[in-house]
Amino acid sequence: MPVPGFAESKLDLPQNPNFVSGTANFNINGNTLTIEQNTEKLIANWSSFNIGKENKVEFKQPNLTSTALNRVNSNDPTHIYGSLKSNGKIILINPNGVLFQEGSRVDVGSIIASTLNLKDKDFINDKYAFETEGLSREINNQGDIQAIEGGTVAIIASQIENKGKIETPNGAVALISGEKVKLSLNGNSLIQYSIERGVLNALIDNKQALKVDNGTIILSAKGVKEVKNAVIKNSGSLRADGITKKGGKIYLSASNGKVLNSGVIAANSQQNQGGSIRVTAENIQIDENSKISTVGKKSGGLIEIGGSWQNSNKEVFQATNTTIAEGTILDASAFDMGDGGEIVVWSDIHNSNSKTTVKGTLKAEGGKIKGNGGRIETSGRALDIDEITISTKSTDGVDGQWLIDPYNITISSGSDTNISGSFSASDNDAVINVGTLESALASSNVNVTTAGGGSQNGDITVDASITSSSSNDLTLDADRHIYINQNICSMGSYQNSLK
């Protein structure tokens, strides 16, 4: 039923609530609207839901898991300039858009803001199935959004832009772009999600800060299958650092589109093991000055860009093109104690159009006090590792491994081309610059492998002299023949292995 007594200005406070399910008491005192929710669940339809700059809306709910579904029936977007508070969970739906303006403040148990609708029946039965009923608009955040520890901030729309700050310690922040989206929640905690149907011009653009200490960050966009136009951009910071625990988890997923990163992605840990970062898309561009890290005090974490180690995890979508630009730093090292972590930069080696380009710095070093080096893989059907810098060194332990894995490989004084994996040929003739190889041997064990592919037989040819003074091992593992046309000289204690 409608509730009388609301202010005339629809820009100051929400207007004309109509109860669909549950009960609540409404009180307006000056510039503040207080909603005292009496039932575990509340459904209210509003003619508008705006909060003016000096205005406040507060939901007082029975407990942390109590939920209020607020649906806006208006042709205009929702504008939040002021303050929105709750001690429980708020769902705010407006198909014409939601704008959290600069200076706005949201303090809640959890919040889901969506331009996709949620049916009343599904909400009552704890089914969070969001779906568009026509064209949906964007959600833009320029303010501060904060949920309680262990809470969830989920934003669901066709296009999402964040120019503000979103934070929930030990919880989850999820920005999801699609036309049909399902969430699974346990109380305030996000358990899992799925995008059942993509949307045209899917876009997620983070220009500021998402922070979830010990938690999970998800940026996931799915476009229309035939168009493959989903885009995820990060020029800000995504941080899931572990303050007292293991580092958190960060996922960027645009399976039929592209991911562009020029910012910071970090799941480090000050006291424990580094966390995990996974970036998957058809095309991945990690631009210069990007910093991606899962550094841990006790051991390094996991960084997967474009795929998993030797495609061992079939659930990880394989990229077609993956580029790590010069100036980029990927770091999965241990800080004090423990082993270095794992870094994979991958594109689908079975796709004739795939290419991996790596020109940045990749580190999976052991702890400064004690610990072994980690492992790094760079793979792709065509591989360009010219100007790459690799380190899996250990101060007090065993140096780690760099895996390159293409098709035919020639080790020469020429530039690195068509290289993938420990050092493996990825497409027709692949070339590894001897300087790149020698530099890597100073801090890592190096495996050069071929599987045979393209129009080649899987041979390894050494056409330049290789000299190393380190104790690390060089392994040449060919699918067919190994041709040694120049000297391989060790002034250290390392072993050469020819297979």
Regions found by a protein language model. Give the residues of each.
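Extracellular and secretory-pathway beta-repeat/beta-biased strand scaffolds
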Residues: 1-499
